[in-house]
A protein has these predicted regions:
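Bacterial N-terminal signal peptides
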Residues: 9-18
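Beta-strand-enriched cores of mature, soluble protein domains
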Residues: 23-159
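Bacterial N-terminal signal peptides that target proteins for export
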Residues: 1-9
């Protein structure tokens, strides 16, 4: 009987440890982000009033709720008609410790409304090696000239 109890206790402890490890692997990262387009290229569609395609490199700085800072390098493309339409791009957030998160983002801009987009995390390095997950970002009203302010959030799972 005591061997059975010891085995049950050992299996219970192992299951609890595995469950705690799985929970510890999911992280929610909230941040504020300032971004600026670098050398944007715009093309107006001939014979389509208000149709503009934009392609640009961009850079930003993210300030995370936990006090960390990350540099954001990304590419961005949009296809707007009179200020509304789809956009997408690819971002890499580089943290001071060398870890990084790379994500694809996409959304639909509506003229006169704040930006909203969704992230799909596609990879990571360092503390985020093998990361997968999702996220979102929302424009914030501001008085910056030539830059944008956003609130963002990642929900990340690491192996």
């Amino acid at each position: 009987m005591s061997k059975h109890i010891c085995a049950t206790v050992a299996l219970t402890l192992l299951a609890c440890a595995s469950w705690q490890a799985a929970i510890a692997a999911e992280q929610i990262l909230e941040f504020k982000l300032v971004v600026k387009l670098i050398d944007p290229k715009t093309l107006e569609a001939p014979s389509v009033e208000g149709q503009v395609v934009l392609l640009s490199k961009a850079h930003g700085v993210a300030f995370f709720k936990d006090g960390r800072v990350a540099s954001k390098d990304f590419i961005f493309s949009s296809d707007y008609n009179k200020g509304s339409g789809p956009f997408f791009g690819y971002s890499t957030y580089q943290f001071e410790d060398g870890s990084s998160i790379t994500a694809r983002f996409a959304g639909t801009q509506r003229a006169g409304q704040m930006t909203h987009g969704e992230y799909t995390v596609i990879s990571g390095t360092g503390a985020y090696a093998g990361a997968k997950g999702t996220g979102s970002f929302d424009g914030v009203p501001h008085k910056l000239t030539g830059a944008n302010l956003l609130n963002g959030k990642f929900t990340i799972t690491t192996p």
